[in-house]
């Protein structure tokens, strides 16, 4: 497993602190949609990395 970039960790941690109830423990697709709604990130790759990081941290 690769080490996540700093911006993925920082953004993921901020989102988990502010919107804890918006994310699911095991559902990557739900977390991906939540990241899309809560941020203005346009890059699909970055959005998926952040959603994957949040899913990993919630488990």
From Swiss-Prot:
Pfam families: Ribosomal_S17e. GO terms for cellular component: cytosol; ribonucleoprotein complex; ribosome. It comes from the Archaea. GO terms for biological process: translation. InterPro entries: Ribosomal_eS17, Ribosomal_eS17_CS, Ribosomal_eS17_sf. SUPFAM superfamilies: Rps17e-like. GO terms for molecular function: structural constituent of ribosome. Transmembrane segments: none annotated. Keywords: Ribonucleoprotein, Ribosomal protein. Belongs to the eukaryotic ribosomal protein eS17 family. This is Small ribosomal subunit protein eS17. It comes from Halobacterium salinarum (strain ATCC 700922 / JCM 11081 / NRC-1) (Halobacterium halobium).
């Amino acid at each position: 497993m690769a080490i996540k970039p700093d911006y993925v960790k920082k953004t993921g941690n901020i989102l988990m602190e502010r919107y804890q109830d918006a994310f699911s423990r095991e559902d990557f697709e739900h977390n991906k949609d939540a990241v899309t709604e809560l941020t203005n990130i346009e890059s699909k790759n970055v959005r998926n990395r952040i959603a994957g990081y949040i899913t990993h941290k919630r488990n």
